[in-house]
């Protein structure tokens, strides 16, 4: 009887390992596609590929995150895209990712993406949307920082918001510079786990240089 139980346990372990390897391999391949994407169509295709992984795994948060991140990149590149509809899709992916995310640091990463979705909507008409999408974008950063104050992407995005806000409204280079400085410093010690987001460092360095 013990032999049968042991055999079942071994087969179960092998099955879980094979499933895990399949997931990791699929994610690695699709992240490579994401990194090499150059056009809106490329990012749309990559997003669809991550959705397929998410549908197969169901309990993982990273495929949903990357599906949304790819749509965010598409939205910034394609000026003809319906930003409200696109951001709505991103927020939906964020909801699914957050439902699966376990740790506060994982959830903080999702609020990075939520901020970008709200910002994309605000930029359709900044003057009329600042009180809605703009405030929501700021709230997303605050929530992310409350979950993980060491995530450098949060400070990079805060710096971007201040950099692009006119001085008379509380923004400008001088206000943005400390945020970029903090992002650059945090990136130096930020540990990137396998398959996890690994973007923003070079952008933060470049933006800090613009503030000098």
Segments from the language model and where they lie:
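Hydrophobic, well-structured mid-protein blocks that either form specific transmembrane helices
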Residues: 87-140
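Structural marker of alpha-solenoid helical repeat scaffolds
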Residues: 56, 100-104, 147, 186
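Canonical positions in the second alpha-helix
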Residues: 53, 97-100, 143-144, 183
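Helix-turn-helix repeat elements of alpha-solenoid scaffolds
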Residues: 35-49, 83-96, 130-138, 177-181
